[in-house]
Amino acid sequence: MNENLTRRHFLAATGTAALAAATTSALAAEGGSGGKPLKILGVSCSPRKGMTTAKAVQAALDAAKNSDARIQVELIDLGGLNIAPWSPKPPEDDMKDILPKFQDPALGGVIIGSPCYFRSLSGLAKCFLERLAPLREPKMVLADKPFGVVTVGTFRNGGQELTIEQIQAILLCYGMIPAGGRPPAFQGGTVLSTKDEISGDELGLGTARNTGLRVADLALRLA
């Protein structure tokens, strides 16, 4: 058991390093770090501000930022904010300050993070993603922009990949391009929280970093 776990940690660590090296080499071949800056927004859709989901998304953002000088990042923590579901009459809530960030011409990609509640995305994540609806009409503002998903559960197999699939299905409705991860998590970041802490899950944090690197790589290639 311990031997298998050690092997998984080794594969995760080497996979992250290999992806970072490949991304750096590819970007260098395309002309180095010149060009316009690109913003990658990370959104923590946990009602608990600054907790494990926010930390996991930040790990993905840090990896993205460190991959190329053109990448700028920003974490949007929805914890403690009031965001209602979509309605024909737009609610007056905190979404009014968030939506303009997704209309920024410099936006290159998005990373969405959600805790796994009952093997599903959080209610806050669902409300937030619904409220991006104004970006679909009359123009698909987010079309052809890459996105990644990072999820946090209290069990290793606690619904993380199911939650990723649910968020991917929603963002495909916005015309966005899903960016997966690398072994051992091909769909995105799958992080384990133990007693409100993720720092001990190097395997899971590696998948979050891989997701950030993939989003950054695609954003730069599509720019």
Give names to the regions the model predicted.
Residues 2-5, 11-138, 186-223:
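N-terminal beta1-alpha1-beta2 submodule of the flavodoxin-like/Rossmannoid cofactor-binding fold
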Residues 143-184:
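Short, glycine-/small-residue-rich phosphate/pyrophosphate-handling segment
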